């Protein structure tokens, strides 16, 4: 799934998640979209574990979906488990993960899409 496709797929999840998405790009090469697609996008380029953990923590009280994408194969599950908030955030439908490659949808126990994972 290409980056733009992943972003648009996540944007489509905005209503079920009940939250807003914000554009946030950590790389110098921000994607250029012809339409305004508000989404939280963390580019794998230059993204390390520390900033990802900080981003995961930042949504705890903000009720804002957070995207965490890694270039080394890690996923948001590892990140959120590290800060002890996986169940809380996933239960609140507050996590969406966007990536440029190796992107797949994440389903909960009921088979409902609850996020997008980028990783190997």
Task: Go through each PLM region and give its residues.
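Class I SAM-dependent methyltransferase SAM-binding "motif I" and its flanking Rossmann-like core
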Residues: 1-38
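A contiguous loop/helix-start segment that scaffolds small-molecule binding in enzyme catalytic cores
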Residues: 33-120
